[in-house]
């Protein structure tokens, strides 16, 4: 039997669809068009930051350090918005997060290649707000801007389903792998609809 979840719209699978598409698109955008920096995958930025420090390439350090700091500030901003606007009646605080994200990403589109550092900082800040505000789909923990946790959870659910044929495990497996597919689709759509990537 298919599991139904009666909860907030922010935890619906439809919401996860759009957030995952957006997450993949944003990561592909900053990596391919803004100087090979990850907007979401801060682990990759930490690796590249460390590599450049060890190589003595100090001109590249800010290239990866600024998005890291912006991501941390984005998490703080989302938490502050939750604290201040959680009791609002007309709007849900997560709707304000989405509105802020849309405005920030719209502004990034007008920044020239010479402003890649600022563009990457804004996108990382926006991604952090998204990942902090939207952390569940149909009651299951998920991340719309990175895949490692979703991949682990999907494979775990597959192992449980293969062993016990538990319907809930199958449902989780399908949802997690679906989210990963949508993330990849978002990244692919950017390439399909954009000109060839250009390095600064």
Protein language model annotation of sequence segments:
Residues 1-9:
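Short, Lys/Arg-rich, polar N-terminal cytosolic tail immediately upstream
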Residues 19-22, 66, 70-74, 78, ...:
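Alpha-helical transmembrane segments in multi-pass membrane proteins
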Residues 104-113:
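C-terminal ends and interior cores of transmembrane alpha-helices
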Residues 118-141:
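Hydrophobic core of transmembrane alpha-helices in multi-pass small-molecule transporters
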């Amino acid at each position: 039997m298919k599991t139904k979840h009666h909860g907030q719209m922010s935890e619906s699978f439809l919401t996860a669809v759009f957030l995952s598409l957006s997450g993949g698109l944003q990561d592909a955008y900053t990596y391919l068009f803004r100087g090979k920096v990850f907007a979401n995958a801060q682990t990759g930025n930490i690796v590249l930051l460390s590599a450049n420090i060890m190589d003595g390439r100090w001109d590249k350090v800010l290239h990866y350090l600024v998005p890291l700091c912006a991501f941390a500030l984005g998490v703080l901003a989302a938490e502050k918005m939750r604290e201040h606007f959680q009791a609002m009646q007309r709007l849900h605080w997560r709707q304000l997060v989405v509105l802020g994200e849309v405005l920030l990403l719209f502004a990034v589109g007008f920044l020239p290649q010479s402003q890649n550092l600022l563009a990457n900082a804004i996108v990382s800040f926006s991604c952090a707000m998204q990942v902090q505000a939207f952390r569940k789909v149909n009651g299951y923990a998920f991340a719309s801007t990175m895949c490692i946790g979703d991949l682990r959870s999907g494979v775990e659910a597959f192992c449980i389903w293969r062993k016990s044929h538990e319907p809930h495990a199958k449902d989780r497996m399908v949802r997690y792998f679906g989210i990963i597919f949508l993330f990849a689709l978002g990244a692919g759509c950017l390439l399909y609809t954009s000109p060839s990537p250009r390095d600064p």
